[in-house]
UniProtKB/Swiss-Prot annotation:
Transmembrane segments: 159-179, 202-222, 243-260, 278-298
Family of the protein in this entry: Belongs to the Casparian strip membrane proteins (CASP) family.
Stretch list, region Disordered: 1-139
Domain of life: Eukaryota
Protein's organism: Zea mays (Maize)
Cytoplasmic side, ranges: 1-158, 223-242, 299-306
GO CC annotation terms, alphabetical: plasma membrane
Keywords for the protein's UniProt record, in alphabetical order: Cell membrane, Membrane, Transmembrane, Transmembrane helix
Lineage: Eukaryota, Viridiplantae, Streptophyta, Embryophyta, Tracheophyta
Membrane topology: Multi-pass membrane protein
Protein name per the record: CASP-like protein 4A1
């Protein structure tokens, strides 16, 4: 029967689709199938066909069914043909939206650390006392400067006093000589007959009076150390008057000189023009003294030492 099975075509085994899960009842196995799987020959005594099939060795793992069904009748089977129930995978779970927890409220900001306390103010170091030799040196410089300034002021006061006295004397001598020149010479002429001589006489009078006033004021200053007229513009007044009187003296003396020269050229040398020339010469000396007084008053105005 084995030889007859080899000559016939090998039918493919089919499963019972009725849901029994076993092979057909009319299929029989040979006695030697349990001993050696390699020599297994399946014989079918079914009335439709008898065929034998060689079953190769298979692994013990599950093998997919060659014709699985969709209606639940199929399943899994092992190498020996035993059918096993197929376990369908569980239905996928409906994807739920991920639960998001609300964000935690922000923590309150920590207060800034208090500023560091300011460093304690260290007491200022006491000023170092200057060395004694420096004090002595500064005193040596200051005291002589003060003394020299005082000496210079005293010298200028004495010089101004002498200049005022000289200006007063010169102006007095000039006006006295010219005033005495009356009814002189062969013509018995007088200075009052000529404008140039009258002009010179008037300037000498004013110069004399001003010089006497300045002499008294300087004497009072040197004796009591106080000004006769304590006015802030006193220095400017002295400087202006000295300049004006010096200019008047030089102009009056020049005009009187021209007139005396004209008389000498026209009428010859005589006592009248000679006395006029003497007064004019003294007026020039008074002009020089007033120029010196103007320099002293300018020094006092800009240096304020007196």
């Amino acid at each position: 029967m084995a030889l007859q099975a080899q000559q016939q075509p090998t039918p493919s085994p089919t499963r019972d689709r009725v849901g029994s899960g076993e092979w057909l009842a009319d299929t029989e196995k040979l006695p030697g199938a349990a001993a050696s799987p390699e020599d297994v020959v399946v014989a079918s005594t079914h009335h439709a066909a008898a065929a034998a099939r060689y079953v190769p060795p298979r692994a013990t793992s599950h093998t997919a069914e060659p014709n699985p069904g969709r209606d639940g009748g199929g399943g899994w089977y092992s190498w020996n043909g035993a059918r096993r129930a197929r376990h369908d995978p569980p239905a996928p779970r409906r994807q739920q939206p991920a639960k998001t927890h609300p964000p935690a409220p922000p923590l309150p900001a920590a207060p800034p650390p208090p500023p560091p306390p300011p460093p304690a103010a260290s007491p200022a170091p006491a000023p170092r006392a200057p060395p004694p030799h420096a004090q002595v040196r500064s005193a040596d410089r200051v005291v002589p400067a003060i003394l020299s300034r005082k000496r210079r002021a005293a010298v200028m006061q004495r010089a101004a006093l002498l200049a005022r006295a000289a200006a007063a004397g010169x102006x007095l001598a000039a006006l006295t000589v010219l005033a005495a020149d009356t009814r002189r010479g062969w013509a018995r002429d007088s200075y009052s007959n000529y404008a140039q001589f009258r002009y010179s006489e008037a300037v000498n009078v004013v110069g004399f009076l001003y010089s006497v006033f300045q002499f008294v004021a300087l004497a009072e200053l040197m004796r009591r150390n106080t000004h006769l007229i304590p006015h802030p513009k006193r220095g400017l007044f002295d400087f202006t008057m000295d300049q004006v009187l010096a200019y008047l003296l030089i102009s009056s003396s020049s005009s009187a000189t021209a007139r005396a020269s004209d008389l000498t050229e026209n009428w010859g040398s005589d006592s009248f023009p000679n006395m006029a020339n003497g007064s004019i010469a003294i007026s020039f000396v008074a002009f020089v003294v007033f120029a010196i007084c103007s320099l002293i008053s300018a020094y006092n105005l800009f240096r304020r030492d007196m």
